[in-house]
Amino acid sequence: GMTATKNSVATARLGAETVSDIAQQIVERVAFAQTDGVDRADVQLEIDALVKNMGTAIEQATFNGDNLVDGTKVGVGNEVTVVNGVKRTGATFGTTSFTFEGVDLGAIKTAMEAIDVGTSTDLAADLATAEGQLAASITASTSLGITENALDGQMEFIDSLTDTLDSGVSSMVDADMEEEAARLQA
């Protein structure tokens, strides 16, 4: 249901934020590698460890078997759809739904993995790659945050609608009971 989907999105957003934090550290390490006298092989070991942590974050950003950040929920036919309501048109009932896509943080990891400051002859290009992947990870986090907020809003609306319907039904029941009591007293 919607609660499970919202929890999946919240978990994915947390994973994407973690990947963004790690991407920022990689950008800093690649920039540091441009400093004269730095042992670039040691810096590369740090980058390799960060990329490994990034992979772990992507794998662990799973809720109830759903991983919305590994790229499997991206593209036509792979979207996630959750039923968020019921509608009535004349005598026919149907459902309303909310559809969204996951993100592909695996592609970000792959691009970061390709950076090798230990052997690179173009550290400026490596830095541009790392910065581009950082921007992509921030976009992914933002997208998931927007989706999470949309689901929150829909859940709040449904809760309010349910409360209103409950109140309306209670009023009708109270009115029927008052009418019946008046009839019995007559």
Predicted regions and their residues:
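Amphipathic alpha-helical coiled-coil/heptad-repeat segments
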Residues: G1-E179, R183
